[in-house]
Amino acid sequence: IQPRYNMVEYADDFGMDNLSKKGKKNIKIAQKQNLDIQFGHKELLEDFDKVMKCTEERKGISLRTKEYYELLLDTYADDAFITLAYFHIHDMLKETKERYEKCLFDLDNCTENAKKKRFTLEELKDSLEKKISKYEEDVKTYGETVCVCGTLTVKYGHTSEILYAGMNEDFKRLMGPYLTW
């Protein structure tokens, strides 16, 4: 296996304190999305292959087949694992609709002379309407839950290598890779 890029990060140097401001911000964004992080083996192979296909399409390249990933998992057995991040679209849609209803209620009860508050609520209303529309479209396309990104990692001694990593471009705004990589 010959990686195109090789990055070394020592465990002692790894942590939130050593991340850039943007890295910390993106981790916080990802944590707010309530992504479901799962670790596993062959049981996650189907979804891992799907995110790798998304990466192939996005980059216009050809990577490996599902059978190859399965062979890696078999070969390295307990020293290989898959990490996936799932986004529960339906749950987020429900939560966003509840926030939208509260926003409408607050707008109805907002006094005429509270112009700043009314303006803020109007902007929030517009933002929530866009999110609801996007989530409804995503539910139609992907179903209630979608795998947004994943990695295939191999442990070797005191180190580990992420051999393959992929993501679904439609959900890049969730910053899922910050929780799986």
Language model features with spans:
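A conserved beta-strand-loop-helix scaffold within acyl/acetyltransferase catalytic domains
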Residues: 1-172
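Conserved acetyl-CoA-binding loop-helix of GNAT-fold acetyltransferases
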Residues: 172-181
